[in-house]
Amino acid sequence: MENQPKLNSSKEVIAFLAERFPLCFTAEGEARPLKIGIFQDLVERVQGEENLSKTQLRSALRLYTSSWRYLYGVKVGAERVDLDGNPCGVLEEQHVEHARKQLEEAKARVQAQRAEQQAKKREAAIAAGETPEPRRPRPAGKKPAPRREAGAAPENRKPRQSPRPQQVRPPRPQVEENQPRPVPVTDISKLQIGQEIKVRAGKSAMDATVLEIAKDGVRVQLSSGLAMIVRAEHLQF
């Protein structure tokens, strides 16, 4: 009788165990917690099959129980199973806590490896004379608008509200034509200290008081208390 081909890797051994004991091992998805002492059960039942050795079984079992999907399955209330899928007791709290720490450490190692790889890429880019572009942070508070599904049933859409009737605003009272218009100052020598005057700023004018008449303009004080020198073309009565 010819010898069966030997399994070379721990992953191949795990695939064999999942096929041989489907109620205990699984090749994908969340794994079930294993019975304490299941290694000895494996030795008794599969040693010699596929030319498996104890070392191969121990390595495959270590890889299986340290995988993320196995650690995810070790949670409060979960039951351990034997090779035939029979329950063998609920997990103890200390075992659940130990699995949680192992999972956190594994995730931290992966994040550290990714950060190290990114740092090496940046260093290589800088050495090559390239400037790596920093990641642009996503603006906080802005969320993408929900897309409207094509072909949505018309009854699911909210009816449009009829436009509100526009309110008729009363006409603004026209400015009396007899209202006196401001007169620009043409001769600053006619101004007197203490005289009330207006300073034109754009389209509006501000009240001011004449403080001093100088050669380059008139020093005035605004109603806000601010004093400044203003040229004649910006003054008006």
Curated annotation (Swiss-Prot):
Protein name: RNA chaperone ProQ
Gene Ontology MF, one: RNA strand annealing activity
Family per record: Belongs to the ProQ family.
Classification via PANTHER family: RNA CHAPERONE PROQ
SMART domains: ProQ
Positions of the UniProt region annotated as Disordered: 106-188
An example Gene Ontology CC term for this record: cytosol
HAMAP family: ProQ (MF_00749)
Start-end of Basic and acidic residues biased regions: 146-158
UniProt record, GO biological process: post-transcriptional regulation of gene expression
InterPro entries given in the database record: ProQ, ProQ/FinO, ProQ/FinO_sf, ProQ_C
Keyword check for Mitochondrion: no
Keywords: Chaperone, Cytoplasm, RNA-binding
Function according to Swiss-Prot or TrEMBL: RNA chaperone with significant RNA binding, RNA strand exchange and RNA duplexing activities. May regulate ProP activity through an RNA-based, post-transcriptional mechanism.
Cellular compartments annotated: Cytoplasm
Principal location listed in the UniProt entry: cytoplasm
